[in-house]
């Protein structure tokens, strides 16, 4: 069916978790208060990362800034960058808490060389300093709900509203992921994309209340909407399907899975003078911005 491979026993909640949660670091974390992040001798701890098929150690700061640089545009406003930094840090620490200490991190990030290559020499210095400042100025800050670290998904552009976590995951464990209106997203030039995929006899058979696809019929089989999006590299989880000359025409709205923070709206809010905390509290209901304490990470001063 157009190259589509169905996972017979696929579970929606587990699939989303695999997509949205970063893999763990070689690290132990204890959350026991609201004081500042403790660092050994004032230097950044090291984490083990798989890069170019090899494992190596880099500083936690280098890794966090590298993810931040890869995940959001360098020309974003300061408060939007800070909000993104908090989401990345929260995901890191939640993975640490949930998954343990023995896994090598594989989440992609940009090195300094990749930043310069992607941004160009004219912007590299300015953008790097903005990323570093956003990371440093939110040092230790994470999002918590009811005293626990939360799942912190984000996406580039919504279809005009974000989706409910409880609805997307089919679970009541995500009360802080409520659907939020993002009216300016629909005005973005990247809001709509049209593509063609091989095969026909495909039909959207389920959507959530925000309009994102939850289920697709492919011939005699039914597949999860997010798996369908990723298999066919669609821009968004909000899409329609139409038979077209033996193929399937896909019209997608937005960019990404639609959960959590819309980066586009976050940048607009920052431009309007909203703070990092105001942005985060808009997209994540009833959460608090806290600070982690007592971090113990495997050290290697040489990063080897």
Annotate the PLM regions.
Residues 1-304:
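Conserved, single-site charged/polar hotspot
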């Amino acid at each position: 069916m157009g190259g589509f491979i169905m996972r017979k026993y696929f579970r929606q909640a587990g699939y989303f978790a695999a997509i949205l949660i970063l893999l763990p670091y070689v690290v132990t974390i204890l959350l026991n208060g609201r004081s500042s992040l403790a660092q050994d001798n004032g230097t950044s701890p090291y984490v083990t990362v798989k890069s170019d098929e090899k494992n190596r150690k880099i500083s936690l700061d280098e890794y966090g800034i590298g993810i931040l640089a890869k995940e959001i545009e360098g020309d974003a406003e300061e408060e939007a960058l800070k909000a993104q930094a908090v989401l990345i840090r929260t995901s890191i620490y939640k993975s640490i808490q949930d998954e343990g200490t023995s896994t090598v991190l594989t989440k992609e990030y940009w090195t300094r060389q990749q930043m310069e290559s992607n941004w160009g020499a004219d912007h590299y210095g300015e953008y790097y300093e903005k990323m570093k400042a956003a990371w440093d100025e939110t040092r230790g800050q994470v999002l918590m709900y009811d005293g626990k670290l939360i799942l912190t998904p984000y996406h580039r552009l919504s279809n005009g509203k974000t989706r409910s976590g409880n609805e997307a995951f089919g679970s009541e464990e995500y009360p802080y992921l409520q659907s939020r209106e993002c009216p300016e997203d629909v005005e973005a030039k990247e809001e709509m994309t049209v593509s063609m995929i091989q095969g026909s006899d495909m039909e959207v058979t389920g959507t959530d209340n925000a309009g994102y696809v939850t289920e697709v019929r492919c011939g005699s089989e039914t597949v999860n909407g997010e798996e369908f999006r990723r298999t066919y590299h669609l821009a968004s989880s909000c899409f329609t399907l139409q038979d077209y000359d033996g193929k399937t025409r896909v019209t997608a709205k937005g960019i990404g899975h639609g959960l959590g923070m819309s980066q586009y709206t976050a940048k607009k809010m920052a431009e309007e003078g909203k703070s990092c905390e105001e942005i985060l509290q808009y997209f994540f209901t009833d959460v608090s911005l806290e600070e982690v304490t007592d971090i113990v990470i495997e050290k290697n001063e040489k990063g080897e």
